[in-house]
Amino acid sequence: MAAAAAARHIPIAHISGGDVTLGAADEYYRHCISKMAAVHFPSCADSAARLVRMGEAPGTVFCVGGLGDENIRTMPKMGRRELCDSTGFPLMQPFALVTYHPETAPDAGSPAAQVQALCAAMATVDGVFWLITGSNADAGGEVCTRIMQDFAAAHPDRAGFVQSLGLRRYLSAMEYAALVAGNSSSGVVETPTFRVPTVNIGRRQAGRTVCANVLCCDADRAAIEAALRKALSKAFAPVAASARSPYNGGNTSEKICTVLQNFDFAKPKIFYDGPVPEFDPQRSVLV
């Protein structure tokens, strides 16, 4: 769609450009869209600066924060008992929210082996109920989902599987979770707002700006187990509680609308080769 729009000289506004995800094929498409876009709405200062280093003019780059962060702060959450009743799982006790997707980069390892390592690590960690959601539609997703379903079926007193929680239930679960684990972007981009201890596994999100509440580890059983135990430790709790989300831009959607209403889309796109200014998602946008 972006290529067709560019060929027809239809302006493109790109949200979350400048991000890096070395373990996902999205990496290629994201940067291609950025080069075709007329205006950019990166989610954090690092991504905004990266766009300028890619040749995008600072006057076209508006660091507005993440829409996911805004959703967390504005969407009414479910009560914990309501969430418990909705899923049918014992979520009044400490629980961990787990989501794992296949890595899709050319050098990605076996998704099945990675999920098996995750399940083996979860089996050794007591004290939490594992609330597991299904994998996405990327190649290997069905295998990942089946392995996680089998784990939940084999440990019905310690784990439960839901294919999809939906946005409201997912954010509600994240709010009450003692731990978030896996390799979803939500574990990096959204958990800092909740300040929940998080384990980011493997390379799928490698390159993203990571906050203090997130521990990154390799996708092998020993590394995952060590990270899970550290994230659940009393020593890590104050570290996670100190997290300050780099994706908090305040009224992100309002900022985007303001720019779109006032931006000069008739101005020709240039390749910028100058200094990189400082960006802050908390600032008001100036067009």
Q: Which residues does each predicted region cover?
A:
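Short acidic-hydrophobic, aromatic-tinged amphipathic segments that line or gate anion-handling sites
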Residues: P42, F62-V64, F161-Q163, L215-D220
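C-terminal amphipathic helix plus adjacent low-complexity
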Residues: S233-V287
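Active-site and donor-binding regions of nucleotide-sugar-utilizing enzymes
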Residues: M1-P58
